[in-house]
Amino acid sequence: APLIAAQGIAILLEAGVPPGVVQLLPGQGETVGAQLTGDDRVRGVMFTGSTEVATLLQRNIASRLDAQGRPIPLIAETGGMKAMIVDSSAFDSAGQRCSALRVLCLQDEIADHTLKMLRGAMAECRMGNPGRLTTDIGPVIDSEAKANIERHIQTMRSKGRPVFQAVRENSEDAREWQSGTFVAPTLIELDDFAELQKEVFGPVLHVVRYNRNQLPELIEQINASGYGLTLGVHTRIDETIAQVTGSAHVGNLYVNRNMVGAVVGVQPFGGEGLSGTGPKAGGPLYLYRLLANRPESALAVTLARQDAEYPVDAQLKAALTQPLNALREWAANRPELQALCTQYGELAQAGTQRLLPGPTGERNTWTLLPRERVLCIADDEQDALTQLAAVLAVGSQVLWPDDTLHRQLVKALPSAVSERIQLAKAENITAQPFDAVIFHGDSDQLRALCEAVAARDGAIVSVQGFARGESNILLERLYIERSLSVNTAAAGGNASLMTIG
């Protein structure tokens, strides 16, 4: 990895990036990473790695604010239990790609036949020096990773789970195995999806069998893991595709194709829940996350430019913004709030789906959906209503502290709005479930809130902090992005080609 990074830096410098703008500091993450993220001069962190380390990074920067008094941005892309509801991509790069298949879910009727073919394919794999074109599987990253993977395999064996390992025997390869950190491709059969509690980052594929009538329960189990990076489904039945894509909580979903190799601008990549903070790499929201200031309409202008070339479906947006319309009508005697409702409603993009460019035989879409619940903290009525308007504009629910100010507002608001609000005791409100935070107040209160949010277990939650009276809330921080890539050729071809005359 350091050699690849060094080559990448060399290419950037050759392309004209000024010396000193980008720096390469190779070393152990525990030392170099901790030193960098702990430095007050660092104004943003982009991280790819484990969920546990991402959580530590969030806690490390939680007490710091930037020059504008805002929390330090953290973009974390982490791993997860990637499932495929029927593929054999698990062993590419020795299973060390963040979207590599971890759990293969096979319908009972095809399980035995598929496993027989998979075991045969594993036995034909060559494991050795990745510098040779004849090598199928290289080493894992280091001895610690090898030990962790082998410990997991042994644990599964001790539980009585069927474990199959195979690799093509070759004397030249065998000599390299003795000195390298190699793990033979491994197949482990599980009784239940929930048996796998954390990601195994290596050439290990777990298999779960399911009854065709239990597909909804299987998807619920996958969602319940809390991870949501990638999911694949192989089926020729449109109803099954709709069922999986409509209920799975994952950032990238693939239909009738492999799950690795996302392309910038075609399949924006990144997970949700325990698998990442967003925004998606290769998507239009990413660079905006790194800006300290920007025009409020900047994102809308960017998306409008894209919409001029590719169609956008905004049917869901109308349903999501009905509570916002009710708030706008209620604010007839509050012109400032009414104007904000109009502004947020025009800027909001939740409930939109966009067709992305891609190769013939493949359909790629990018959908923006609202986060489920947003914690809103303010000690002023106008700020509380500003936060409410922003959250309703994207279609999320609101979590308010149960105090006099917010109780009175709930009573005064129309039912279409108040039913989108939940109250919780202020002293333990950060223990409640929520997906994002909007705060108005002073910097000391903001630091304390960031530290409390960072101390939570589970998914990393970002905090937007503002001074009292500010209304430039970033709506894109309240979205969930989902990318769907469908191999249309597998279902009979690309019908759009018939329109070419």
Where are these regions (language model features)?
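Hydrophobic packing residues within well-ordered alpha-helices of enzyme cores
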Residues: 5-8, 36, 57-58, 114, ...
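Adenylate-forming
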Residues: 55, 82-87, 100-101, 204-208
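Extended, hydrophobic alpha-helical segments in both membrane/secreted and soluble proteins
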Residues: 1-12, 29-33, 42-44, 53, ...
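Active-site PLP-lysine loop of aminotransferase-like
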Residues: 48-50, 73-79, 88-105, 127, ...
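Conserved C-terminal structural/oligomerization subdomain of aldehyde/semialdehyde dehydrogenase
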Residues: 16-17, 41-42, 46, 89-92, ...
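Conserved PLP cofactor-binding pocket of PLP-dependent enzymes
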Residues: 161-181
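Flexible glycine/proline-rich, aromatic-decorated loop/lid segments
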Residues: 60-79, 88-89, 253-264
